[in-house]
Amino acid sequence: MISYAPLWETMERRGATTYTLQVKGGISSSTIRRMKAGESVSTNTLEALCKLFNCALADIVEYRPDE
């Protein structure tokens, strides 16, 4: 499964909030809800997050094998 834990950690380190994602990143509240629920998002969203935080994809998502 894909985990967004690295995103929340990156946001915490940089003092960002979900409001930051919406206003500066153009990420919708429904997309934020999907990420919080561990659901899939588009590659365009992942790209927008990488641009917003000037980071690598590994700072946004990670793969965790199903148990």
Indicate where each model-derived feature is located:
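Short C-terminal boundary/hinge segments that cap the last helix of small helical domains
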Residues: 54-67
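A short, Lys/Arg-rich alpha-helix, primarily the initiator
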Residues: 1-20
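Short, basic-rich loop-to-helix N-cap that marks the start of a DNA-contacting helix
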Residues: 38-51
